[in-house]
Structure formats: C-alpha cells, structure tokens
Amino acid sequence: MRPRRRQQRLVRGVVYVLVLLVVIGMILAVVGPALATAAPTAPESEAAPASQQASQPASDAASSSRSSSRPAPVVVLATNNLTWADLQEQASREGAGASSGSSGVGSAADRLLAFAQRGEPMNLSVRTPADRTCPADAWLTLGRGKRASAVEAAASCAGPTAAIPRSTPLVGALGQDVSVQTVGPSTQLATGAPGGSANRPAPVAPSVDQALAADAELTIVDTASAASTDAERIAALDEALRMVQEQSRPGTRIIVASLADDEAPGPQVAVLPAGTRSARGTSGGLVVGDSTHQAGLTQLTDLTPTLVSALAGRRDPAFDGHALTLPETGRAGVATTDTSAATGDARISRLADDALHARASQATVMRAGALLMGLAVALLVWAAVALRAPKASRREALRRRVTWVAVYLSGLPTALLLVNAAPWWRVGARDGSPSGWASLVAVVAAALVAAGIVGLAAGIAALVRRLRRPRSAASPSPSPSALGAAAATEPVGSPNTPSARGEAAVEPAPDETASPAPTLSPPPRNGTSLTALLVAAAIPLAWLVDAAVGAPLAFNNPLGMNAVVAGRFYGVSNTAFALVAGALIVVIAGVWEVLGGGRRSALLVTALLGGAALLVDGAPQLGADVGGALTLVPTLAFLTAGLANLRLSWRRWLAIGAITVLVVGGFAVVDLLRPGEPTHLGRFARQVADGSAAGVLGRKAYALIGPFVTKPIMAAALACAVVIVAAALWWGRRQVRAWRNGTSPYAWLAPTAHGDNPRVGGQESGSPTRGMSPSGRWVTTALKSLGVLTLVAVLVNDSGVTMAGFILAAAAPALLALTLAGSESAR
C-alpha cells in the first residue's frame, strides 16, 4: 500500500503545482492590465491630443454644437482590388511624366494619397471563408459583421449566388433612428432590400449626389461597380471622394475602403477619419487594430461594429470584429499623429511594405512547411538505412554524421522564425507583388541562421564542459564503461536490474530510494548531447517569447500566420504550437534524463518547463491559444506519469480531463474579466454560455474534414499518408520486437559492458538491449507522449493533420539527435 500512497501523493502534487501556476498566471493577467490602466485618463471625447484641440477651427465647434442628439454622418466609399502599392505606382507615373492618357489617373492617385496622409491610413484584411474575397462576399460580410460567402466556391465573382436579404445585422444594430442610403446594387447585400426595414425606405440612389441629398446618417457607395482596372477604380474613387467633400454636410466622417481582393489576395487600402482611436493606441504613427494587435492593420469584420458604435453608440457582441472609435466629427487634416508630408509618405510606404510582406509570407508558408516536414521524414529514412548494421569501421563515423545532421535540422524551426527579422520579402519585389525568389531567399537565409544556432549551442556546450572539467577532475565519477560493467554483473531478474523494474512495476525512484549504498551521479554529458538539447530547447523558447511580446517575428513569417489567410494575427498560431509542443516534449524528457531520472525530477521538470509553456500559450494577453491549452494539459500529465513510472487509470484520465476544462475555463474567465475586448477564447466562452457555440464547433469540424471530402487530391494524399504511417508503424513494431529479442540490426547503438560492440543478427546471445539503463525509458515515454500530443492536437485544432506534420518536423530531429548523442556518451 505504501507505493500506492506515494503514487497518489505524486499525482496530487502534479495537479496542485499545475493549478497553482495557472492561478498565479491568472492573477498576473488580471492585476497587470489593471495596474497599467490605473492612471487617470481623459474621457473619450477629451482623449484627442491638445495639439488637435488647438488646431480645430471654430466651424468644427459650431458644427458639433449644432445638434448634440444627432451624430455626424458617415459616408463609406468602397472599392475593390486596390492596394497602397497600386496608388503609389499610379502616382509615380504621374511624377515621371507619363502619357496624357494616364495623367488624370496619376493626379487622382496623388489626391487619394494626400487624403490618406491627412487621415488614418490602414491595411484592411478582407479574408472571408473562401481563399479569395469576391465583392459580393465582402458586401455580405459587411452587413453581417461576420465572415460570409455570397458566391459559391466554384463560381466566378461575376455576381452573387446568394439572395439579397430583407434586412441585415448591420441595419438591425443601427436601429430605426439611423437612416441609411446606398449607391450601387451590390450594397444591398450589406443593407438589405429597399423597404425591408424602417430605416431603409428609399430605393438605391442612382448617383452619389442624389444619395447625399437624402442627408442620411449612413451613406454607403460602391464606387467600383462599373470599373474593371486599377486606373478606372482609382478615377471613380477620386471622383466620388471629391463629390462627398464638396456636397456633404459639414463634419461628415469619410471612410475609404477596398473591400475585396479577388484578383490578388492580400491587404487592401483603408482610410479612416483623422482622430480615429483604438483601445491599443498607436505604433509608429499608425492605429493599432484592436482585433489584430498589429499597427496599421484592421479587418473587414471590424468595420461593421465601428459603424454601429459611431452612429448608434452601442456595441453588439454578435459581431466578430472589434470596433474602432471614430471621431465625433470629421476634421480634415487632424490625425492622431504627425501628418507632415514626410511622415505621411513614411506611413504609406510602411503599409505598402506590410502588404508585400503578407503576400510573400502566404506564397512561402506552404513551401517552407513542406520542406521542413520533408527534411524530417528524409532524415528518419536516411538514419534507418545508414545505421542498419554498418561495418564496424564506419559505425562511429556514421553515428556522428547522422547525429549532427539531426542537430542541424532541429535548428531550422527556430531559424525560420528568426529570419523574419531581415526583409527577405523585398527581394525581387515589383509593383507590390513578391518575387518567386523571395521564398528561396528566406529558406537559404534560414539555413544559414540554423548553422549559426548550432554553432552557438556548440560553443555554449564547450564552455559548460570546460567549466565542469576542474570539478570532475577533483572528484572523478565512475566511467560509463565501469557503470556498464556493474550493470552487467547483476544477474538477470535481480531487483537491481532494469528488466526487473519494468514500466509496469512501481518501485522507489533513484532519488527516493532508502538503500544505504551511495548513489552514483549520472555520467557527464558529452558536447554533442548538450548541443542537441540546447538546439531543441531553442524552439519553444524562441516561439513562446515571440508570442509573449506580440508575435513580431511570427506574424507574416515564412512558417507562420499572415494577413492574407487572416486566421490569427497574434499569440501562438497552430503551426507555432505544433513546433513548440513537439520540441517541448523532447526537451522535458531529455532534461529529466540528464538530471538522473526519478519522480521528483519528473514533477519538477514538467511543472517548471511545461507549466511555463502552458501559461504563455493559454494566457489571453499572451498566446491566447485555446486549442493549445486543451492539448498541452493532458499531454503533460501523460508525460509526467510516464517519466515517474506511474500507471494512468481511467479515473485519473477523467481527472485529467476535468483539470483540462478547469484550466481552459480559467483562462476564458480571465479573458472576459480583463479590460478591453476579449480574444477569441473569451468570445468562444460567451458562445458556450449563450448556446451558439455549436456553429463554431461545426465550422471547425468541417475545417478538419472538409478538404478531404471536397477535394479528391486531398483525399488521395490522406490515403497515401495513412498507408505510409501504417507501414512505418509495422516496421517499428518489428524493430522493437527484434530489439527485445536481441536480433536487432541496430543493437550496436546500445551501450554495452566494457565498451564492446555486440554482433548483430542474433549471433550474440547476451544482447545489451536486454539490460539497458532505466534512463533509456525517457525515449519510449517521449514517443508515447508525442503520440498523445499528435492525436489531441489533430482533433481539437482546425489545422487538422497539418499539426501532425509540424510536430514531426520539430520532434523527430531533436529526439534522434539526443538518442544518438546519449548512446555515444554512454559508450
């Protein structure tokens, strides 16, 4: 009964430590923002800088006091397929003395850029459920405040396949007191059919001037309904803008936005009124999007709550976007930052570069991801072939070669993150479009950075070994050969042999034994083993630290999230989590083995490393990754139990499930209680509370299986992957059986007594694989934990089987390198 009580105490200890760490993180998450916002702030109406108030003309004050009950009207001038690079290109042609046919367009582009410099220019992410956003999709999304499709995936963007709604959530949220007027037939997808609601009694106006004559609070104009080229769109937008500036009511707030990107997916032009504010302030002269956490970037779904907030003074939680705060009136030339010509040009150039960066990331992410996974698979195949019963004279050379290649490939995930600090996306770019060479440059640069990471880790390992050398010389520890000889002299079945202490048995751990005999410290690790461990640890360290500071390197990364896909803009993405978790499992198991094993070590290492990773990944103000937290808690519990040599019964699995729900629920509560708009974790908690989460879960489930149902090529690829995985598992089971029977062609990799290399193929009866050190259990435990991680990650994340590929890419090289380096150091 005593060992069973120890098991129960250990399990309770693991649970208490994890819960304590999560509670501490929650307290910090709540108290931190509260302390940061404790300083008194001016009311929203007084938040404008004093320089703005001093520069307001007297007419603005008169206009604002003219009618306190009626907000200043808002005019939305919409176009499509227009980027900052397009405007800069047309304006540069005008400056270069282009032909007279394009001179008018160049002047129009100049005027639009000047208008943007006086306002708040931004990039607009217009992603909808499809890979490209048709104009009809954009209008329907604007009306619903959620991503929506008006055009079937296989249809063209010529016209909507969805019926025009009678009313829309946008019009309903505005209420009956806010009148709406539109120009262009496509706008009905955003506002509903004429007469469908009390505030839409009039039909679609035939022209901008007639719409302005109606003096509605909200006027939405489709300026690109008759345009098909950049020049035509720019000219039409400029004409509509001039008309609004001349004929609209004083103080009218003007929004310019390109809503669709069906020609070249990527961030679009958006200009908000000067003085527009965000809860996240500004950065580099650009408004930080509240939903994106990125400077100068907002989403199409943010426009809907922004309009409702500006005109109706309310915020509807049914909308997915986050509202920006428009100024009370339109004040031309008064922005939240310096609007000099040089500053305005710098802001526009930065936005154009950010859009180019996003497009280059989208073009690179599939190639870089496939390369990373392919290299991991190739490494495993090469290692299996090269290390299979080689000649005795080549064994050590092959071992070292495979080990260092694995160490190098283990550095690639970190390198692909760090390479984003250099402007690789600008190589060969032209007219706002990335070059095909940019992807190659990113990969080559990452290869060089990976070499630097390995070199740095090797230098640190050499320094550590040099510092430890005098101490080890003063009190030498037993050599690995002596340890192996001592293990070999124990009779088979002795209680001191590892075979008698199998994983199913529960015996006191090395650091808990009551034997009076002195325990031996683990032999010093060689430089290769320490280098491999450091390179593997760099993966979770780099990606999690980057996520904690806002993901400046992961956003628009060759491997990460970008503004084109627009699935996530901050925190820990699915790709980042797969890389982090895969490497983290290997690192925790490797560190535990270095510390000599034992239950206390398992608890300590998992609680510190795993708990820290869980806090960063799940905290709403850091990683905000609900799927990652759901995956990490059971995986860490399984890993701890495996390292501590404990058996998880179904009751303990139920307890782990309850703890997982508790941890994720705690993160959601923190998200809802902290100041500002909640992240998607908090919104999902609200949806669970009001019963609308079924739709979200359905969409995620479809995202998991949909590609394999609708695309035959994806189904064929999945079938091939299943066959390959099944073959690999069959081969692995055969090798494990041969290893246990002493007939494995890889038996020479095992540490042996007196440093002798056994013969393979069953010709040597006393195989060393029967008497390996208990520390060898860490490899088996890590493999099983990676299996749990992969299974749960695939099921709870909408990236699906892609998660398995990135887990393999991060874990396989690291695990192989540590295993081979460890066996070399033990010889």
Predicted feature descriptions by range:
Residues 17-29:
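Hydrophobic membrane-insertion alpha-helices, especially the h-region
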Residues 36-51, 55-361:
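Soluble extramembrane regions of membrane proteins in the secretory/endomembrane system
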Residues 314-320, 327-328, 337-375, 537-577, ...:
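Transmembrane catalytic cores of multi-pass membrane glycosyltransferases
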Residues 347-473, 518-563, 575-596, 600:
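Core alpha-helical transmembrane segments of integral membrane proteins
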Residues 389-403, 464-529, 735-777, 781:
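Membrane-interfacial, low-structure loops and terminal tails that flank and connect transmembrane helices
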Residues 406-416, 445-451, 537, 604-614, ...:
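Hydrophobic membrane-spanning alpha-helices of multi-pass integral membrane proteins
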Residues 617-626, 795-802:
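Membrane-interface helix caps and helix-loop-helix hairpins in membrane proteins
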Residues 650-658, 662-667, 678-686, 690, ...:
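Long, compositionally biased intrinsically disordered regions
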